[in-house]
Amino acid sequence: RGNRDFHPTPLSSMLVEGCLETGRDVTQGGAVYNSSGVQGVGVADTADSLAAIDEVVFKRKAHTLFEVIDAVKRDFVGRERIRAELLAAPKFGNDLDMPDAYAVLVVRIFRDALSRHTSTRGGPYIPGFYSSTCHVGFGSRTEALPSGRKKGAPFAASLGCCNGSDRQGPTALLNSAAKIDARLAPNGYALNLKFDAPLMKSREAKGVMTALVEGFFARGGMEVQLNVLDPAILIEARDNPGRHPGIVVRVAGYCAYFDEL
């Protein structure tokens, strides 16, 4: 409502289909395509938490749900054994049916929840799953999770897996992501892959990368972005700002100079 009442955009509205015809600004719902994107952050964290509870509490019956909740509330202090078992549970990003099915469920629930509401402009809310850098900020404000994640740790970036959880390589990660119906994310999603530069120098490596990406899209994937970087150079650039001004990294649908991040 603030944009509608105090921040109209007449120039851009002139260039948007529907606004001139209806005599309404885009902030007033004049556009033909009048949707508002809302990003879901923490898909993998939620899926991993559900999978860990399923595995440790219900399948193995190693601990009760009360014991898991108690450990989470304590940030696993004095409950390191429970945390180790939760961390060892199946994780999204490894082409495993259980956590991947939970990720699909989380995405569908998020889509269904948004579909029940409309914006102040009268348009639909549509889901997307890209976090830019807010997965770090959100994680810093969130308590521990049943996935084994400790208080304050970053969430998974966009639609990727949690940090360090992809143990079966990039093909498995892409297979997990491809199980999510891209039609449930009309506002898009981001999936980041990172590779060490020395591994990508040969023609054969580039051919493997091409096949990897093409296979992902053939299975219904929507978006993947690649960072091919030398970790040593990144560390040097971080510790010595200005020494490597030309390093460009992919963030979330856009590129940025590493020095400026």
Q: What are the roles of these predicted feature ranges?
A:
Residues 1-261:
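Acidic, glycine-enriched catalytic cores built around paired aspartates
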